[in-house]
Amino acid sequence: MSEILIEEIKDQIVVKDEEIDVSELEVKLNVTKPVGYDTVVVIEGAPVVEEAKQQDFFRFLSSKVLAKIGKVKENGFYMPFEEKNGKKMSLGLVFADFENVDGADLCVQELDGKQILKNHTFVVRKLNQLEKAFSTPDEFSFEEREFKEREHLRSWLTDYYGRDQFISYYGNRVSVNWNRKSDVPEQIVDRENWTETYVQWSPMGTYLVSLHLRGIQLWGGESWGMCARFLHPYVKFVDFSPNEKYLVSWSYEPVRLPPIGHPARETMPFTDDDEGKHCFVWDIASGRILRSFKIPPQPEGSKDGKKVIWPIFKWSADDKYLARVTVGQSISVYETPSLALVDKKTIKIDGVQNFEWCPVSDALGRDSKEQLLAYWTPEITNQPARVALISIPSKSTIRTKNLFNVSDCKLYWQSNGDYLCVKVDRHTKTKKSTFSNLEIFRIREKNIPVEVVDLKDVVLNFAWEPKSDRFAIISANDQVLNSTNVKTNLSFYGFEQKKNTPSTFRHIITFDKKTCNSLFMAPKGRFMVAATLGSSTQYDLEFYDLDFDTEKKEPDALANVQQIGSAEHFGMTELEWDPSGRYVTTSSTIWRHKLENGYRLCDFRGTLLREEMIGEFKQFIWRPRPPSPLTKEDMKKIRKKLKDYNRLFDEEDIAEQSSANRELAARRRQLISEWQKYRDEVIARVAEERAITGQPAITVPAEEEEIIQETVEEVISEEIEPVED
């Protein structure tokens, strides 16, 4: 094509700028117009003033309100006016043009929602934000997402052998494994750089939590895919509600939002109200932020001012309430999912130090919707120390107990909510010696009586046996507490109920001259480990059975406590029972020291089953199990057949000893599963056909059991004999 022809075509093409519509392209590319309003803020809620007084009000804003925030440009204030009764009156709006963007951003952060004057609360926004709000379309259009079925998040509970899983974190690798007693663990998944700090399980074991510089990730299902993600930069701590509905995250660093108009701001879950906050409460199902909080006041004596007592919030048993204490002042109780304060105000309690929720939701009766909360306050001037029980949401005081000469208190709820033990550390009037006693609230009884267990020593540790009225304590004389080799006493107590005599907690037995300082009750009760943790020279483990079987055991005895084993794990830093209460793991982690890092697995008697020395070992955590769905009747039926189950389990243990037997057993289970599936389909089809033809359904009488017998043929020997013609 000749150049002359091209020039002729260009002359014929006439395009006017006003005819070009690029609005759709601007919306698609999220183009921000350079309007130059980044430094302008709009303040709503200002006092209504006459036009003659506007300069006085501007001077008040500059010198009193905005002096520590930023400098406003010369003639940078503007107030719109309207005519009222012959006078020009302001509309309660003020425009302020700052010298830089930082001043405008800080003004929004510091003044928005704050009561600046007695009857005036400011609402502050940047002018760019208002422009964006005005451009919001009248009709909302949403993008439809294709439904994807989720994996079964509790599939591990269907394991044929009923095994438990655990996490092993070493170096930069995280692995999930099946426990196989003394055999090498069966690895399920192993990933590199799965987390950047540490890992943890949710309370029921549904999710595995990994923490990263940008936030939190939840993992689960058979494929261990990502279930949820929560953006929280530099997150340090995570806590779940008991039923895994909500999640609380906390970071040393407050959240900072990108400048208005920045593309990254649109992808963040945070609003302007969340800026500068450290703690966030999330709804796990939706991924929404329910509420954000600023960092609480730091404890006195913290070296760098970055110490925090975790968890900041404590949850009620039913996930309905979470509460936080402001030491010395109040307890704030929030209701989910709105996260609004109950009755819109905190519970003012002078001197309050700590509180604990009752671990069950029916402590006040099955029909009651009230949750029980216990707190304590120290002695203040002429007022005694006090322990109180209050119900939420009514905030009614259920029971109080005054205490004297108190140094400290610790609250210990029994797992069923039947008892609350308050460990009270007391001092003599001369304050030269200290001792402890136990104030036990019997929650289920009328008027909640309080029983006092007096002791001569200082109680160092306390532990209830799960779902029981027995407990153990470690105590020592206050004169030897500061010595290098402290000898402690291990004591057991139980609740005695006899006819014609008052019920009371009675001492059972004491083991003296021990070195233990920590107690770990098995999740199912009966067994306990007394350990020495935190020492640089002693790493003792002692295993106890509270119901040791002997011929001399008295039928009405509260317990028959017997030491059934002992062990030592050099460098031990952590101890944990598995969810079944059959195994105990002790670990030595690199976060404390670099000596013989790894873990040991023992049974409940203390017999060593397996030991693994792993360099840069960081964590060993058993996967929790949700509460059992079995009823008391189901449990009784299982106990009746326990001998049959034991015989079956022994046979399976023998079969599992070789890999060939394991493969054969797995193949048989697969065939039985396929046959059972086919059988269920046939039964359903036959039932449908009988219903169509009017025939009654085939049922098995309730008093009879359906028995499926499997016949397995095995070749014991094979011999070939020649046959003569």
UniProtKB/Swiss-Prot annotation:
Coiled-coil stretches: 630-671
UniProt modified residues of type Phosphoserine: S23, S135
Name by which UniProt lists this protein: Eukaryotic translation initiation factor 3 subunit B
GO molecular function: RNA binding; translation initiation factor activity; translation initiation factor binding
SUPFAM superfamilies noted in UniProt: DPP6 N-terminal domain-like (SSF82171)
Family to which the UniProt record says this protein belongs: Belongs to the eIF-3 subunit B family.
Domain RRM: 39-129
Principal cellular location given in the protein's record: cytoplasm
Subunit-structure text: Component of the eukaryotic translation initiation factor 3 (eIF-3) complex. The eIF-3 complex appears to include tif32/eif3a, SPAC25G10.08/eif3b, tif33/eif3c, SPBC4C3.07/eif3f, tif35/eif3g and sum1/eif3i. This set of common subunits may also associate exclusively with either moe1/eif3d and int6/eif3e, or with SPAC821.05/eif3h and SPAC1751.03/eif3m. The eIF-3 complex may also include SPAC3A12.13c/eif3j.
Chain segments annotated as transmembrane: none
Cellular compartment(s): Cytoplasm
GO biological process: formation of cytoplasmic translation initiation complex; translational initiation
One of the Pfam families matching this protein, by short name: eIF2A
PTM-bearing positions, type Phosphothreonine: T136
Ranges of the WD repeats in the UniProt entry: 190-229, 304-344, 347-386
Task of the protein: RNA-binding component of the eukaryotic translation initiation factor 3 (eIF-3) complex, which is involved in protein synthesis of a specialized repertoire of mRNAs and, together with other initiation factors, stimulates binding of mRNA and methionyl-tRNAi to the 40S ribosome. The eIF-3 complex specifically targets and initiates translation of a subset of mRNAs involved in cell proliferation.
Example of a GO cellular component annotation carried by this entry: cytosol
The entry's keywords: Coiled coil, Cytoplasm, Initiation factor, Phosphoprotein, Protein biosynthesis, Repeat, RNA-binding, WD repeat
CDD domains for this protein: RRM_eIF3B
